Amino acid sequence: MDISTDNPDHGFQFPGTFELSAMGAAERGLETELPRLLAATGVELLQESVSWKHSSSGKYVSVKIGFRAESREQFDAAHQALRDHPEVKWTL
């Protein structure tokens, strides 16, 4: 199947700045581990864009990470690294 658009300005543009979020158990240290994991994929981590928030019960943490990717392949590798982490319940 060929997917195309009538407006080439829609969709991801590379190189570009992006943000991914991941949620998992709060006691697993994901706040520090996930940014390191993304950096290891070769994307440029934007330290000022790394943030996290604990759930109201304190059981879970949502980690938001900003980064710069030079290509779709880099973006996909970064997203896959988060999805592959055994403590990550979901990504966005």
UniProtKB/Swiss-Prot annotation:
Gene3D superfamilies, alphabetized: 3.30.70.260
Coiled-coil boundaries: none
Domain of life, source organism: Bacteria
Signal sequence coordinates: none
Family listed: Belongs to the UPF0250 family.
Protein name in UniProt: UPF0250 protein XOO4915
Species name: Xanthomonas oryzae pv. oryzae (strain KACC10331 / KXO85)
